[in-house]
Amino acid sequence: VVKPQAEAVASLIPSKLGEVMATVQASQATDPRAAGVAYTDAKALKFKADGSNLLEVVARANRILNGNKVPFINRTLAVGSGVAEVFRKNKDLLNVSFSADNGGLLRDATIAKVGGFTVVEEPALPDAFAVFYEKNAFALAVRAADVPAGATFGDSVAQDGFALRHICDYDPTYAEDRSVVDAYFGAAVLDARRATAAGLA
């Protein structure tokens, strides 16, 4: 009974981080120095649905992060399902990525490596959203709470790399055992200069 409970709790954690990532502002398509806008804004930098401007959008993101003195290593491009589809339709890009990789991309469920970014799909992100970031742009904290002294049984369980609390006790009101899995978790933008977003036209 613990495994499905732990899976259910762990599945909520990426959604929280996805909500935080979706707040990152996009560069304006015509002027990278202008104030950022929401990725849904008509002025926002966007991938074309036919994929014809993939490299241009990635180059713009690099320009913005480079201008903010963001390190070149540990750069990731996390994309929603709609943007992921655009990348997957670009056979030339995928062929280059896979031929240079010896199979690691497939093992890691990575879409491609392009312009210094590792491209990954994140279902918790909005479909038409992409966020370019360096690993220190965001923080995710997950903590298993202490087991209360009154619990009949309590322990930590691991699920998808997260530590969760499992407690059991008896509920006399309903004459049944209770099993609860929970954790404290939160996400935040640590440094907005280390991330920029784009939408999908």
Residues covered by each model-derived region:
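Generic secondary-structure signature for well-ordered alpha-helical cores
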Residues: 6-14, 70, 172, 184, ...
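Flexible, active-site-adjacent loop/turn segments at secondary-structure boundaries
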Residues: 15, 19, 37, 85, ...
